[in-house]
Amino acid sequence: MVDIIFHYPFLGAMGDHSKKKPGTAMCVGCGSQIHDQFILRVSPDLEWHAACLKCAECSQYLDETCTCFVRDGKTYCKRDYVRLFGIKCAQCQVGFSSSDLVMRARDSVYHIECFRCSVCSRQLLPGDEFSLREHELLCRADHGLLLERAAAGSPRSPGPLPGTPPGLHLPDAGSGQQVSLRTHVHKQAEKTTRVRTVLNEKQLHTLRTCYAANPRPDALMKEQLVEMTGLSPRVIRVWFQNKRCKDKKKSILMKQLQQQQHSDKASLQGLTGTLLVAGSPSAHENAVQGSAVEVQTYQPPWKALSEFALQSDLDQPAFQQLVSFSESGSLGNSSGSDVTSLSSQLPDTPNSMVPSPVET
């Protein structure tokens, strides 16, 4: 139904239509009293001058010969109302005619030619499975590909390592290219090479057991580890530092992986579900949301009085004939034949009203 608002913003300066006196007609358009012979009435109690009732878009005059629509306090002709507020195709944004066949997908309506997959542009026929994602149609094949890509994730190029000078490039792993780092830092004097310390299984087991109990051992614990492993204090100190750094990097990486998995699951929530099945085309009967408001003509009370006066003027000759008949009867100048001819013109008395003779 068309929403008709009875309280309009412009009635404050033009007069309140709801507080009009009984028997008076106030124009909703200009707010003044209507003294015209005819009043255009829209809905039960909205009345206009004939010159005030017009379309808000094209200014076409509206009367009882055309269809009028009221929305948000404005009047529209049928053409502009369909153009502004009618149902449009979700693909081409063009309105429908009453003879068009449409395809429906949930709350969206499409032309038959516009009901296509947004990826491969294949027209979806009745019985085809499809999905509706962000107001875009996807056929079954493209829907499956989208699910696979979202589950696998798009490959990302590795970003620059922290602390790497600009201009350095690291090729992808497995490409077979040699990593080349070119810097503009001046070469420093060659330093003495350090001997790499190789730990055996027993030493590693001792250090790992101590690290599991306390990742930051104190000086007394380090002295005991020196006696137990036979390693230098510097080697033990560096091993604990490297172990703490590796564990910290591993925890950060695991946290990032968990966040990535959570975001992938959230992105897949809009894609999972049962595929829709295209139905048969249906006729688009209601091209306009709402029903038209009938515009009627209204005749004021004085119009009925004037018609009654005209009718009484037409009946005046018969009244004069009866008056002349009464005057002729009072003077006694009329003959019996005149009375008989005049009485023959009068209607006969019904039989039902003739009294029956009373038996004595």
UniProtKB/Swiss-Prot annotation:
Skewed-composition ranges (Low complexity): 328-337
Binding region for DNA: 192-251
Keywords: Developmental protein, DNA-binding, Homeobox, LIM domain, Metal-binding, Nucleus, Phosphoprotein, Repeat, Zinc
Biased composition (Polar residues): 338-360
Principal subcellular localisation of the protein: nucleus
Region (Disordered) location: 151-177, 328-360
SMART domains membership: HOX, LIM
InterPro entries tied to this protein: HD (IPR001356), Homeobox_CS (IPR017970), Homeodomain-like_sf (IPR009057), ISL1/2-like (IPR047169), ISL1/2-like_LIM1 (IPR047244), Znf_LIM (IPR001781)
Pfam family name, one: LIM
One MF annotation (Gene Ontology) recorded for this entry: metal ion binding
Tagged with keyword DNA-binding: yes
Sequence segments annotated as region (LIM-binding domain (LID)): 273-302
Domain LIM zinc-binding: 25-86, 87-149
Localization, UniProt: Nucleus
Any Gene Ontology CC annotation: nucleus
Database matches in PROSITE patterns: HOMEOBOX_1 (PS00027), HOMEOBOX_2 (PS50071), LIM_DOMAIN_1 (PS00478), LIM_DOMAIN_2 (PS50023)
Modified residues (Phosphoserine): S154, S157, S280
GO term, biological process aspect, one: axonogenesis
Function of the protein: Transcriptional factor that defines subclasses of motoneurons that segregate into columns in the spinal cord and select distinct axon pathways.
Subunit note: Interacts with LHX4.
Name this polypeptide is given: Insulin gene enhancer protein ISL-2
Source organism of this protein record: Rattus norvegicus (Rat)
Lineage: Eukaryota, Metazoa, Chordata, Craniata, Vertebrata
